[in-house]
Amino acid sequence: MFKLVSEFEPTGDQPQAIEKLVEGLNRGMRFQTLLGVTGSGKTFTMANVIARVNRPALVISPNKTLAAQLYQEFKTFFPENRVEFFISYYDYYQPEAYIPTKDLYIEKNADINDVIVRMRMSTLKSVRTRRDVVVVASVSCIYATGDPNDFDRMNINLAVGDRIDVLELAERLARIGYQRTEDVSLSGCFRLKGDTVEIYPTYQDEGIRIEFFGDEVDSITLIDRFNRTTLEHLDKIIIYPAVEFITTEEKLKRAVESIREELNERLSELKKQGKILEYERLKQRTLNDIELLETMGYCPGIENYSRHFDGRKPGEPPYTLLDYFDKDFIVFIDESHITVPQLRAMYNGDRSRKKNLVEYGFRLPSAYDNRPLTFEEFLKKTGQIIFVSATPGDFELSISEQVVEQIIRPTGLVDPEVEVRPTAGQVDDLVNEIVKVKERGERALVTVLTKKTAELLSEHLTELGIRSLYLHSELDAIERVEVLKKLRRGDVDVVVGVNLLREGLDLPEVSLVAIMDADVEGFLRSETTLIQIIGRTARNVNGKVIMYADRITNAMKRAIEETNRRRRIQLEYNRKHGITPRSVIKPLEIEVFEQFMVKEEPERYGDTVKNIFEMKKTLSPEEYMAVLEEEMYRAASELRYEDAAALRDELFRIREEIKKKKGL
């Protein structure tokens, strides 16, 4: 079923890791962990495991940048199988919210990326129709999507010779989300001309032409979307829905009736509680929505009524991508030390935001059920899970029936030496080290604690003739990748940033990582974070890490000890097998963003820092500070450290501005 294509055979620790993981799956182990160091080829190991067990797979990544990279790699490994991409389709997302302390209502605002919509629909179709499927997804996969049973039931099966007239087909297409139009460049539409119907699905590049002779299907052909030439003649075809959420007229009527019932119950509660303002607000808003649903079949915020459309009971989980898979699918949770906390945080973050909307009469209680899965529901809807990380968390290690280590790299590279140097004169010392790196034609990364420090240090290095750029959270993913491409090409010598882990991209040219203020305890200098930072040099034979600190914290001690443990194992393996380490040689490829026009849209669990900063224009300083503080704690709990640090810096800046205005 799966055909793995690679010019390389598994080497180093990969063969034993593959064998152990496959054996664990075959023995029915529910949870396993692949503890693989940076650069050990964890993606190749995952691909080999998938090919060996021949089962559909879902790979969950902590962010879209990493998801895009994994998607590209799996496409290379499985060119003859289906590899799909499933991330949030929002280019911009500001969720609906209410802050009662400020009496501030924030309306939902969103832009949808049509390219991602197409890729999501392709995913749903592939998962429902084939088994040789690998889906690379972000945490969006635990958010609500359409009922898979509706997706199956409402397919249109057509074969040459079938008796159906043109208008009947047009009506059926409209019922599953296709719009009639003359603009054939659009996806999810159809064109009607005489006895011919041309259909342009959202899930594939090719169009479909159905030609009729009277009320009989005369021919079915696949056509080129743009010049409309014939590509292939078919005897039969299945046309799948154009949208994720499909609503029949019967479902719509049932939903409206159910919404009315809930509204009456809730209004009765508010009246008893003496909440007159909330009573009137909810009554007016919900009746307006009902009127739109009855006349247009749609209303703004329709997703808040999803429970009524699905026929779910209060508290029942929504349908998600997980419900589309066959029951024996495997889940890989990549960078599990980040992704697992994100999966845990989604439900509570969503519910806390909606709590105010429900309590203050902006939404019915059923809005709670338009939500992501709880972590417990996620575990119930999945079967066998393999956690993948260089630094797995306590949860993964405690629940796994086996932890498989992948310490040896195929290149023979060993973990870098870690030096601790005093902070006195650290900038001058750093400059000297960067000059040495530059002379060897290599690159450096410097990680600092604040955005302001990153800017100042980068400017200082530039003044000294060292080509430097800094990474910060206000750059979107495409801009961030462009900075890293400049580093790889040699257009710049060093990149300075607050959290250089976010990308997780391969940077084989980097031989030096400098960690400034390594002894300042906090989320940016935890054991896990330090080990991940150290791993940034693990693809270069000259890799070295310098921690600037005046004391050794517990986090530093544990990170250095773990790095030295791995280094000893790697050196012994190389000595035993006569291996000479060599740097990774990796061509500068076209990035996935350029290939698929994937923009970095915020996940529904939180806005990008850029979007939050935009709110300053419409809020008072006190309101703005309340939003900053709430989002800062949320970002930190989800291990989005750079976002948390940027929000913290902005919060401090606004506080200082207020103090100055008050003359304090």
Swiss-Prot record:
Domain UVR: 622-657
Residues spanned by motif Beta-hairpin: 89-112
Domain Helicase ATP-binding: from-to ranges: 23-412
Keyword Protease: no
Database matches in SUPFAM superfamilies: C-terminal UvrC-binding domain of UvrB, P-loop containing nucleoside triphosphate hydrolases
Family matches, as SMART domains: DEXDc, HELICc
A GO CC term attached to the entry: excinuclease repair complex
Disulfide bonds: none
Pfam families on file: Helicase_C (PF00271), ResIII (PF04851), UVR (PF02151), UvrB (PF12344), UvrB_inter (PF17757)
Residues that, per the record, bind ATP: G36, V37, T38, G39, S40, G41, K42, T43
Keywords assigned: ATP-binding, Cytoplasm, DNA damage, DNA excision, DNA repair, Excision nuclease, Nucleotide-binding, SOS response
Gene Ontology molecular function: any one: excinuclease ABC activity
Predominant location: cytoplasm
Subcellular location, record wording: Cytoplasm
Gene Ontology biological process: nucleotide-excision repair, DNA damage recognition; SOS response
Domain Helicase C-terminal: 429-588
Keyword Methyltransferase assigned: no
Family: Belongs to the UvrB family.
Oligomer and partners: Forms a heterotetramer with UvrA during the search for lesions. Interacts with UvrC in an incision complex.
Biological function: The UvrABC repair system catalyzes the recognition and processing of DNA lesions. A damage recognition complex composed of 2 UvrA and 2 UvrB subunits scans DNA for abnormalities. Upon binding of the UvrA(2)B(2) complex to a putative damaged site, the DNA wraps around one UvrB monomer. DNA wrap is dependent on ATP binding by UvrB and probably causes local melting of the DNA helix, facilitating insertion of UvrB beta-hairpin between the DNA strands. Then UvrB probes one DNA strand for the presence of a lesion.
Domain remarks: The beta-hairpin motif is involved in DNA binding.
Protein name per the record: UvrABC system protein B
